[in-house]
């Protein structure tokens, strides 16, 4: 997933967490939800690692940790470790989508 869409996904997750539970929202809420449910999402290993990193930065530093310069650099670092495309062997309905 390109940097811009992966970053938009992170923003969408933070926004949803704030809007659906405004009274009990904490920065770690979004990170915890993602870790718990990410295995059910179709996403590449690189995207998973990037989103996880962004949400951890948000949890620890708030929006200050999600500056464009930092997120673009981290995305490039993560993207360099993985192939540009990944093929899922099948649509597994009863197993985790992200192995591990």
Q: Regions from the language model: what does each represent?
A:
Residues 1-100:
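Metal-dependent phosphohydrolase cores
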